[in-house]
């Protein structure tokens, strides 16, 4: 009877908790519209950045490509900072609302820069090859604007993913949300890469950046309007402290003999972690098991565990730390997967600038808009994968494709895209050498299609792996890790381009006198080596939280 009463009391308490009544599918429109607007904004100013720097600020081609890589690197690195702030201090909702406002300030400043002549260098004189360089003041204001839009974009993209997934309790509902999330992300990216970039190239930069600011403003208003429906997860302090504690405790007890008895280990976690602890630490990374091992110094006079949190951790805290360590090799493989793509994106813009971009006498493709091909085919194949390819594979083989298998397929398509790019560039250089008419920009399409298909396989799967396998208290960090990988890859691509430029003659300012095809073959070789490394890592990796039934395609998901 006592148990029954306590159970009824607990149910009554939960039903009276306002946070329990929030969340669910009512939040989906607010989340998706916010994401859609922010995607239009970030891709609108970001995809044409190289062209903007070259044409309006008179920065040299390779230097502009390098600046773009650095900007993209920061955009994708900073989400982990936003994740730390959300996980440890403020929660998702305040971080997202603040970030959208900061982004709005940045897009407004970009609009102002292109509206006032004295904030940009004077246009080049007709027929002159010498153009006025930007002043320090002009560059300074430009960098402030870029810093604001970078912070705003970084604080929303993957924090929105974690905030949206937090609105649902069941893993399958979270999976369905991620499908909608990536669909909205790609639709926004396509819109920004086509409509906004076309406006910048054919109307004015002022109008293009102004439209970015409008989309940003709509995102901010819609997100704030939905606050009363969101489920707010209160941060329980820094989850990173427990990770450091595991290292400290294991080091302090490094001479202790590891026990094989479960009663010798401290079993109790805190908060959400208390319900998921294991009775015995796993055998992998056994030296860390000492952090949860109880000895005389860890017991107080009453025989209970000591209150010294730096000497004794729970088994669950140890296992959480191990889970992160197991993911590090896979994380590195994803990083080296994204590096060739970052190189390719920069080189593709430079190639397009010296190719025939006219599709008709009255229509010319923007060099920055070519990335839309990646987004379109990524969007299409995300839908095909979830609604046709994955269910068909499951029906034929009898078991679903695991996330790591999906990532492996993405590796293959990425390598194929680099090889195609190398062949096309060799043909283009041959045409230039023979004095023929510039090749059509459509020759770049097949490689970009392969990149898009590859992203449809590996991008959502990587997010699913990190989100599913990371500890409960680090879910924001989990979703941001994919972005961090992309950010590091942009820095690595900048380093690769810099090394090639210093050691070879393949990348002059005029790529018609270079060998960009050789650059592509270098990244093809790197991609093949990385694929081999990934296959070894994935072969030995054992899923911690994700089970086979989590990968299975639900008919309801297909309809949705």
Curated annotation (Swiss-Prot):
The subcellular location is: Membrane
GO molecular function per UniProt: chloride transmembrane transporter activity
One Pfam family here: PTR2
Membrane-protein topology: Multi-pass membrane protein
- Ranges that cross the membrane: 34-54, 77-97, 101-121, 141-161, 177-197, 207-227, 323-343, 372-392, 404-424, 441-461, 480-500, 520-540
Tissue note: Expressed in the root epidermis or cortex.
- Domain of life, per the record? Eukaryota
The protein's matches in PROSITE patterns, at most eight in alphabetical order, are given as: PTR2_1 (PS01022)
* Gene3D superfamilies, A to Z: MFS general substrate transporter like domains
- What is one GO biological process annotated to this record? oligopeptide transport
Q: Which UniProt keywords apply?
A: Membrane, Nitrate assimilation, Transmembrane, Transmembrane helix, Transport
Region spans: Disordered: 1-20
Q: Name one GO cellular component term.
A: membrane
Q: Which PANTHER family match?
A: OLIGOPEPTIDE TRANSPORTER-RELATED
State the function annotated in the UniProt record.
Transporter involved in a passive nitrate efflux.
Of which family is this protein a member?
A: Belongs to the major facilitator superfamily. Proton-dependent oligopeptide transporter (POT/PTR) (TC 2.A.17) family.
What name does UniProt use for this protein? Answer: Protein NRT1/ PTR FAMILY 2.5
Organism from which the protein derives = Arabidopsis thaliana
């Amino acid at each position: 009877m006592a148990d029954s009463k306590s159970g009824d009391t607990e149910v009554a308490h939960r039903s009276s908790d306002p946070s329990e009544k929030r969340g669910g599918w009512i939040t989906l429109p607010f989340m998706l519209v916010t994401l859609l607007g922010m995607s239009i904004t970030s891709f609108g100013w970001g995809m044409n950045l190289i062209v903007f720097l070259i044409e309006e600020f008179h920065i040299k081609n390779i230097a502009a490509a390098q600046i773009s890589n650095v900007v993209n690197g920061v955009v994708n690195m900073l989400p982990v900072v936003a994740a730390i702030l959300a996980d440890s201090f403020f929660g998702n909702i305040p971080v997202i609302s603040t970030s959208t406002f900061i982004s709005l300030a940045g897009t407004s400043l970009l609009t102002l820069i292109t509206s006032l002549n004295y904030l940009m260098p004077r246009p080049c004189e007709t027929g002159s090859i010498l153009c006025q360089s930007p002043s320090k003041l002009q560059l300074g204001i430009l960098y402030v604007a870029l810093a604001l839009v970078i912070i705003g974009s970084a604080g929303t993209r993957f924090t929105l993913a974690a905030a949206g997934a937090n609105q649902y309790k069941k893993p399958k509902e979270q999976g369905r949300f991620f499908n909608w999330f990536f669909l909205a992300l790609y639709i926004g990216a396509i819109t920004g890469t086509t409509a906004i970039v076309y406006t910048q190239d054919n109307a004015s930069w002022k109008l293009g950046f102004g439209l970015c600011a409008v989309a940003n403003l709509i995102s901010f208003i819609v997100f704030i309007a939905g606050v009363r429906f969101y489920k707010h997860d209160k941060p329980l302090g820094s989850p990173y402290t427990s990770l450091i504690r595991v290292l400290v405790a294991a080091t302090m007890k490094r001479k202790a003999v590891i026990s094989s008895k479960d009663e010798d280990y401290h079993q109790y976690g805190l908060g959400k972690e208390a319900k998921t602890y294991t009775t015995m630490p796993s055998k992998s990374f056994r030296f860390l098991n000492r952090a949860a091992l109880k000895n005389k110094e860890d017991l107080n006079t009453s025989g209970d565990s000591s209150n010294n949190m730096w000497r004794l951790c729970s088994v669950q805290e140890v296992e959480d730390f191990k889970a992160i360590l197991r993911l590090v090799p896979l994380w590195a493989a994803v990083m080296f997967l994204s590096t060739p793509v970052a190189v390719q994106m920069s080189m593709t813009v430079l190639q397009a600038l010296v190719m025939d971009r006219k599709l008709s006498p009255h229509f010319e493709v923007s060099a920055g808009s070519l990335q839309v091909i990646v987004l379109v085919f990524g969007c299409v194949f995300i839908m095909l994968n979830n609604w046709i390819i994955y269910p068909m594979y499951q029906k034929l083989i009898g078991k679903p494709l695991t996330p790591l298998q999906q990532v492996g397929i993405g590796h293959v398509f990425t390598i194929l895209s680099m090889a195609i790019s190398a062949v096309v560039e060799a043909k283009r250089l041959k045409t230039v050498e023979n004095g023929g008419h510039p090749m059509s920009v459509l020759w770049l399409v097949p490689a970009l299609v392969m990149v898009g298909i590859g992203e449809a396989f590996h991008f959502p799967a990587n997010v699913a792996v990190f989100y599913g396998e990371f500890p409960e208290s680090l879910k924001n960090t989990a979703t941001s890790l994919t972005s961090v990988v992309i950010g590091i890859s942009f820095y690595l691509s900048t380093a690769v381009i810099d090394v090639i430029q210093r050691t070879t003659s393949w990348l002059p300012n005029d790529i018609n006198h270079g060998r960009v095809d050789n650059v592509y073959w270098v990244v093809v070789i790197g991609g093949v080596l990385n694929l081999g490394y990934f296959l070894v890592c994935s072969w030995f990796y054992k899923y911690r939280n994700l089970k086979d039934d989590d990968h299975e395609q639900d008919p309801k998901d297909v309809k949705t």
